[in-house]
Structures are given as structure tokens and as C-alpha cells.
């Protein structure tokens, strides 16, 4: 018998072949089972975690197949409906963190537990300026003299010092430069300087954190001396790191969301009062209520790290207010600025002003004046409205992504309106579709 034939039929060779066949069979079976699972598993139409609609199976046509859009749609569908998608994405994020990455999906892993979105210079700055100016030009009532613009910097500017040292945005305030350019191009509008107010509040916050660390160090040293360690070794003290605990309600921005906190909105409210000649109500005078400690916002959805602790949402309320809040699109009338049903959902920030509506009409019988305000805004304003209602008998809140009739026409039809405020945050103003319809 040929020697090669003997080797090919040896027990070891047969075992190897069986192992190879078994391995291939198992892999094939896994792929088949996984494919069947992908096809028959229940499909969601909306991702609460990402707060967006999931892709549906694309409609086939020869044209779509030819131009590649059909296969692209299939890939998007499979990606959106991949089984155990969220756990796998968390695993991916954790791996990237372990490899030392400090930026994931345009999110900086910043100090004190903050996740901060990178800033992209707006591509439609001229359009923003033009639309703002068109609004004022179209107003024919006395409110024309009281049009104010409030551009709100996000955490990448206010908390710039918290960014990783390797971040290109560290020490570079491009967002503030853009704000100043927009303000300079609108000389006839009154500027609300939210940046200076937030910058001062951030400096105070950092100072308070430093004092807390100093006090903690002093206490630790005192405890060490009193413990009588003969070898002089210093015990490891618990770190006091203001802001690292996401339950801290005194930060200016949420750790896992792009919005400012209620405290941050209060700082913005102070800046508005300064520009509008109003006397702000002291922060201590509001009744504060913590409504959740488990808020995971828009940045959390981009990062996909299910191990991140939730943020705290705190409401500031004035019990003396007598409010009537009307939603013309639904016909709903209520006496509160909040829809607490959203606290049972992931998108908890939507509790402010009941999420998205083209127009909200707010009347306060106990306001300290008979002035009326038209507020044209993005979602940042939703958490500042509870402060503004104290000073205006009536506030008309417009979200021009959905309101299609032009706020300038509304203002001209309501000569009792005394003030107009345009409030937008700098992170989303460039992509906010509502900017195109503000006049």
C-alpha cells in the first residue's frame, strides 16, 4: 500500500476531517439559524432608544436595483433590525473606550462624566441671518422695536475645559465666533448674551467644585492625623468630583443629552431678563421637584452605552402662577406646562411643554405685567418657558418646523404683542428646518 494512502486514512487524519466537517456544519447551521431569526423575529417600527423611525423593507423596482438604492435600502433595513442590536452597539462602544478612544460617533468622552457633541461650523449661516432679518422686516407693529435674538452655546463651548486634551475643539471656541458673527449681522435686533451668563455660571461651578475638593482633602488629612497611622501613609480619600454624578441637578447641561438643564435654562432666563429690562425671580424662590433620575438623552442614543447612569430632571415651579395652556393643533387645554406621561418613556425631556406643537398659547393670570411675547424657538426654549411665564400675561410659542403660516403675519394680526424672542441653540440651528419658516 502506498505510504500516502496510509497517512490519508490514519485515525488522526480522519479525526481532523471530522472536526473540519463538524466546524463547517456548525458555522453553516449558525448562519442559517441566525438568518431565519433575522427574518422571523418581531420587527419594531420605532427605536425608543434612538428616538427615530426604523427603516422598512425597500420597495423593489428595476430602477432602484440599477441605481443601487434598493440594495442600500436592504442594508439599512438589516442594520436597523439586527437582533440584539443595542447590546452589540454597547459592546462596540465599550471596546472603543478600552482602546483609549476619546471621541466616538462625534461624541467627546469629557471630564466629570460628560458626553459632549462635537461642533460643526454651520453651512447655512447666511440663510439664518437672512431669515432672522426677514422676520423683523415683515413686522409692522410696535413689537418690531423689541425683537431679541438669543443664541445659546452648547456644552462644547461652556464646558470647553472638560474636553479631552486631544480634542480638536479643546481651547477653540468656534461656536462663539459663529454666534458673534450672526449677532453682528443683525444690528437692529437686541442681543441676549446667553454665552456670558453661562460662562460665568460655569466658572462659578468650577470654583465650587474646587472648594469641595479642597474641603474633602482637608477632611481626609484631618481624619488621617486623628487615626494615628504610625507609618504616615495617607489613606485614599473618596474623590469629590462635582458633576461626575449625573444626579447632580446644578450642572448647566445634561451629561447624556444635548439640552441644558433646568438650572442652565434659569441662567439663560437671567440673561434674557437683563436684555429685556425684567427683574428675574431668585432661583431659590422656585419650588423645585426632582421628577426623574433616569433620563438618558440624545447623546446617550448616539453613544449606545447602556451602562451610563441616568441624568436628573428637576422642575422649577412658581405655585402662585395661574396658567391656561392651549394646544390649537389638538384642542387640548390644561393648567400645566408639563406632560408627565413622558417620564415613563425614554424621551423624558419632551415633558417640557408637551413635546412638539406648531403653536402653544400660554396665559398667566398672575403675571407681573400685561406684556405679551411671541417666542420662536427650538426645544431649548421648552425648559425656559416656565421662567418666562412669570413676566408675560400671554406667550405664543411657535415651532416653525410645524407652523406653516408665518409668525410675522400672526404678530401683525395681534398688535397687543409687545415682545418677540428668537431662541435657538448653536448645535442644531444649522439643520433646524424651522429656520426657513420663521417669518
What are these regions (language model features)?
Residues 1-439:
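Extracellular glycan-modifying ectodomains
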